[in-house]
Amino acid sequence: MSEQFPTSDNVDIMLFSEGTYPYVKGGVSAWILQLIEGSPQYTFGVCFIGAQEIMDGKKLEISYRFPENLKHLEVHYLFDNDSAPLAKRIKGSKEGFEAVENLYNSFKDIKNDIPKILQNIEFYTKEVTFKDFLYSERSWEFISKTYEENCPDVPFVDYFWTLRNIHKPIWVLAEIVQNLPKTKVFHAPSTGYAGFLGALSSYDRNKPLFLTEHGIYTRERKIDMLSADWIEYKKPSLLQQPEEYNYIKRMWVNFFDKIGVFCYHRSNHILSLFSGAQKIQISFGADASKTQIIPNGVDVDTLKATMKNRQEIPKKIVTLIGRVVPIKDIKTFIRAIKIASETMPEIEGWIVGAVEEDSEYVDECQQMAISLALKNKKQIFDGNKSDMTAEEIENSADKIKLFGHSDIKKILPKSALQTLSSISEGMPLVILEGFAAGVPCVATDVGSCRDLIEGGINEEDIALGKAGAITGIANPAALAKEYIRFLNFENGEWKKAQEIGLKRVEKYYRQEMFLKDYKKLYDNAIDLSWDQLFEKVN
């Protein structure tokens, strides 16, 4: 697909996509596409923000189609060096840097609010410009002063680049706001940079802002923050002091906490996918009166139709559909298949999901499978494309098979069980898609997995029963035990779980329900200012 982006001066809804649609395959990207395609009555724009255009030596490529009602797409990178203005020695504004110091103090201490002046886009374009922040004498004085006051034992170069990288995106985002098309409703699918951009846009245009959190962004950043390749402050381990990394990590954690609250405060509606996430939002600073649950929905009829391609007694294939990244804990799944294979030699583990995001982790997973005698040799991937065809992978003697991102309508009919071994999830669409295709699920107790598998909407949902099983995280033996239980088809457990999953997804998680809920919210807001909607719903 060539990178010919649609552009428009005017859209109904602007979605802010942080590292997801249209480049990165995954659940949030699929949700964005589903929302746009399922809402043809509105015109949409997407503002994509990523870290860098070149990742692991390769340029990001478009991974999803553009629906007809996607009228505008723009792409920005927060940490590409070519976004910085040319260096020039300047003094900088005293008053402006007092505000920057207040901003810094608000990031440093979660109890402090972000200064009100920073809600105004003119602060970033007139008071303290991007050039002021990068090159002025007052900026250097500010960084030097805060370093001496807070962490003089940390190497200055580490502190300098951390502080720069924390603050730099704010000016990049402010510049984006100035050039966005005319928009009726802003919608962020996460807090973080996307949520900050949404809040800043809403303040600038006085237009409504919706926030939909698929996972709890701040909590997930605490898990994987130091894995980003733009946070570079390595030091020989023998020379490290325990507090060195703790202070710099705390700076990042507080930053994401703070911009999350900034987005919560500005959002007219704060949406989550399940009750557990709603409670976490409130504990992180969201106004409970603004929160609402809208579960994901799937195209039940299309997926249910794939059951005609299913064998009456399926092969003993356990499929993990998800990106091959550490947060999905693919290694625990591989270990679980090894344990299960000692009791059930015919079992196979299929890994179906994007492999281009973390090539080092993909290599580690393949090497583990080879060392456990579950895989014969390493596959070579060019982006998401394997050096083996899907047919060759399926027919190989391997017990662990990597398919890359694939059409689940072809994968699910061949799968007996679906699994997730993740250490963090929001509300995984893949579980619901599996239910609709007649595939029970064994998953770790993260996000809404328990609610989906055991029921959580209401008492009637719970009474339906269990459409699979839940285990603890990082417990391959527990996963293996459940795989063996369900794949012993004679005991009737698999058939019972399949029927419960089909009933649950039909009753509570149809795509039409999800789209109807968003249509109601959009219709209620689309002709109003932020203030008018605030008065209407409060």
Residue ranges and their predicted role:
Residues 276, 297:
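Carbohydrate-associated surface elements
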Residues 428-431, 449:
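Short glycine/serine-rich donor-binding loops of glycosyltransferases
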